């Protein structure tokens, strides 16, 4: 037992079976005492091939080779040698037998005595995951004397000074202290430590699991400080009773991940990157540095962090070759010295001197101690000591699991590496399902370069099965594609490799993997991780046995079953009585798994059956034919019986169906012959649908009608507002209501109100300057606006009320329509009932027999309806004939009242076609009558069409009757035939007719008779029809006459209604025309009234001006006389140039202006007026201000919204037609003169020193330069101020006051000035001075009447040179009676200082003098008729 186990465990010097343990101690003692040669010992040790290979021959007692004793605790527990319990004893006594006894390695735990299990309880940790051969190779490098670079000094865990927002500063400080105390110098906290800390919170496991998943953001199984702080924070949340979030808030997640990245980047990267690991050995110089020192086997230290250092005392040996101990075969033999075994540090690296040399291997297999990692397989290496023992494979943990016990190539029967499979446990731990695996994974440590065979070992299969069961939680037996992607993706391989692996593992393309296929996939992944390429085709060793055997088994079973079916002659056999067990003839199933012909062969199962089929004899074939014939006969007999039963059932069902049909026919006949049957179809679905469509049409018209009503309401509101404006303007002529707004729709805007207020202020100012009271206004400024707003509010309120009423009507109409629609729907049928009705009445979706029956019922119903209609018509005809016979004298009355009952009878008893035809006939009659009334020729064949229609209807009715009777006869014959067929038996012949005959002819069916009496009934009906035909024709003629009379009466009523409608329309049009005429007359009347008012005002002004002129003449005569006396006295005195003009200028210009201004109002509008200025003169100031912006509201064309159209019409209606000559010469500033700011700018411009410039520029189109005056006030402030005065009601009064005050300073010329000034006033714009341009205009128009005065003397020096400096001042034109102009002589005396000017001309003159304007001499042209006035010479 020991030999075989040690063979697979790799022990080379294991004891021979049966040898006592104490017999080995002398050799251990002799070897320990320093013997260097191997004496011929017992033969049991001779054939022990150890793991050193060639070294065995020269090393002598080479049993003390390094023994790999670090086996897992579960398998090789007693393999720890030289550890506490044995080490002190060996150190004290040297080479004592107990020491060697404690080194029995490689034995199974159950095969050793209890005393050898003491060293296993030394407390050393057991390594769970073996290292790769590359790691072992790197660990050998320090044996050669080259010390590895010292690792960087571990610094304390540095936590960045970053403040976490989700915890307080105090909590963060506490957590930092706790974290540092837990992790020490590390940067992360292990999962176990974190678990220990988290469990102190006493929270449930589910909450702690959630906390771990949320905290471990890196999914590394370790916690950085921010993750640890987050875990503490979540624990605090749960302890305080709050729920854990399903996912971390984005802010917290970002903070934690950022801080983790900072900590990760702070880790110093001082260690050199390891070289790329390959299967190539490292043949560097350090390999040969320590050749003299024999290898020092180390005692096993599994899972010690210094395990790599324990192995560094061995010489650097590249692994990967097929040698169990990792030594090269080419290495030179070691010298046979016992000193090589002295420094055996079997548990403490770097301290070999503390342990005594322990000769191991006498009782145990020589195994390298201190090394428990997996090693490549070691081929048997015999040492020459003997060949009676089988070669031993040593040095592997998985050597126990890699024992081939079956045929090579099968799963689990493979020469697996004796040292096991590296990193298979790490791969298992990586792929196991665990919480938090969703976040990521790391494939670090999974790759290697171990030798992996094609086949799957048992241990590997067990690991893969455990993985499969762990992931297959529901025990489905397979793993889906999504789960497999998650598992295989954690291996870290490329997607392309995983796709190829999946294709190989899932050959049937089922999208899922069972346990064996999953093992194949994992094995391919494991091979790929160890550097093997993924094969393009799955090798035979990896084909799952279940799949391979299943396919073969299925093919075998199919062939066997097919051949067995061919061999079995059980065609006519019905039971097991004829069965005979014949082993020779039986095909016989032989399992290929239990009985194998050879190594790989299996029994050809189909061979026997094929041979037996070929060996059938003729008798056997005949027997089979006979049996098959018997079976066929039996089947035929069974089919016949079944057919008979089915026929019986069909006949019974048919009889029941016929009975039901007969009952249905009787019920239908009863319904058709019922007196109220005509009212049955009045409320049909078609009529309901028609009514619903009509209702929808009417409902669609409601919005259109409502919109029309709203439009009419809107027009009414606009007309009412316009009418109110007209009435208000009529009642308050001087109010602001006469203003027509310039806003949209004629509304008065704020600008219009501002203009109106400005005009009112100018009117009041003019009245104040004129010394007259302000003209009384009917209302204040805002009264008209308030009245308009009140009326507008009233109209709007009424419109809103009407709108509310309209909406209420709309809503009520909609509600009524909905109620009607609901009533129509309620009366109708539901979808299910409608489906049933259409199925059983319209024969939709039923069988052919049922459909024919339904059509038969419909035809019989129509036939009965036709019969009833004929009878009803006959009865109606008889009643009409009797009524006409009883009352022959009441023809007229009967003709008037007969249409109504006739129509009702026809509508009640006639068919739908008849009613349609009658309606069409009546419509044709009405059309013909209307055509005749319109003078068109109606159709001549109207009477013929009626007769033809009657004949056609008669023939159709006869045809329908005949067809109905034929159908009745056919149905009766068919029924009789069916009854005869069903009564096949002689016993039922007498009973069945008696029971079946009465239903076809129930007593209620009056129209039906048997087949024998149908002919007589038909003849009787034909005779009755002939007799009734004449009566019916007579009734039809009478009915037609009555209908014609009724149609004529209706047409007459319609014509009367049309005439009444036309009369009403004409009356309405007349009322509308009268209303329009009334509105127009009102406008004209208002215009006439306004014109009369203006004429009266003009006459009053003329009278006032005339009186003022007369008074002025008297004063002027006295003043002139006084002036002449003064002139005579100072004749010898020379007047200065400056005084003369100062004294003379008021005499010439001011009286001229004062005399002209009164004449503006008294004179009739002369030729050449501009439309707007004349309007300003005639109309009120409020109207004149807005005449250029908007039309007045009193024009006849008030309906037009065009302001220009109103303006023209208003001007035409109020102003006499002027001559067109002066109009083109109007200045361009006229269109802009209504702006008060423009006038202000003109005033500012005129107040400048060059005040004469605006005057000539303004008069350039109308005035000649030679008539201009250097110091004239044409462009000064006098223009604008006089304009304001003119626009006021008392504007003329101010000028009258000026003429009264200064009238004596000039010759009295009222008439000439009055006659000639008005055109100038009217030819200028409203805002420009009406009086200023007048003198140049008059001078231009009448140059011949007034000769220019002589030039002044050379003494004066004009200040402002101008081309017209020598021209006289602009004198007004004089009448023919004016005296000749006095010659220029002595300048007149200065005017009295107390005489102020009447207008703004005086201020303008003073301003011009102050500005430095020089005055020239002027002469006064005296054209007055006063004889007492003398001439003033310049």
Curated annotation (Swiss-Prot):
Coiled coil start-end = 607-815, 941-1137
Instruction: Write one Pfam family the protein is assigned to.
Output: EH
* Annotated Acidic residues bias: 1129-1140, 1267-1287
- The question of whether Signal is a record keyword is answered with no
Alphabetized PROSITE patterns for the sequence: EF_HAND_2, EH, WH2
Could you tell me which residue ranges the EF-hand domain spans?
203-238, 493-528
What does the record say about its membrane topology? Answer: Peripheral membrane protein
**Family membership:** Belongs to the PAN1 family.
| Residue span(s) of domain EH | 171-259, 460-549
Per UniProt, the ranges with Basic and acidic residues bias are: 783-814, 911-929, 949-981, 1016-1063, 1085-1105, 1112-1124, 1257-1266
> Could you tell me where the Pro residues compositional bias lies?
294-303, 1215-1225, 1345-1395
Q: Which InterPro entries match?
A: DUF1720 (IPR013182), EF-hand-dom_pair (IPR011992), EF_hand_dom (IPR002048), EH_dom (IPR000261), WH2_dom (IPR003124)
Q: Name one GO cellular component term.
A: endosome membrane
Question: Compositional bias (Low complexity) spans?
Answer: 28-49, 349-359, 1173-1193
Boundaries of every WH2 domain copy: 1401-1418
Q: Give the quaternary structure.
A: Component of the PAN1 actin cytoskeleton-regulatory complex.
Polar residues bias (residue ranges): 55-68, 88-120, 306-341, 361-370, 600-611, 895-910, 1144-1155, 1320-1329, 1421-1434
* Function of the molecule: Component of the PAN1 actin cytoskeleton-regulatory complex required for the internalization of endosomes during actin-coupled endocytosis. The complex links the site of endocytosis to the cell membrane-associated actin cytoskeleton. Mediates uptake of external molecules and vacuolar degradation of plasma membrane proteins. Plays a role in the proper organization of the cell membrane-associated actin cytoskeleton and promotes its destabilization.
* Keyword DNA repair listed: no
Q: Where is this region: Disordered?
A: 1-133, 271-380, 587-615, 768-814, 862-1063, 1078-1434
Task: Output this protein's name.
Answer: Actin cytoskeleton-regulatory complex protein pan1
Q: Which GO terms describe its molecular function?
A: actin binding; calcium ion binding
List localization entries. Cell membrane; Endosome membrane; Cytoplasm, Cytoskeleton, Actin patch
Organism lineage string: Eukaryota, Fungi, Dikarya, Ascomycota, Pezizomycotina
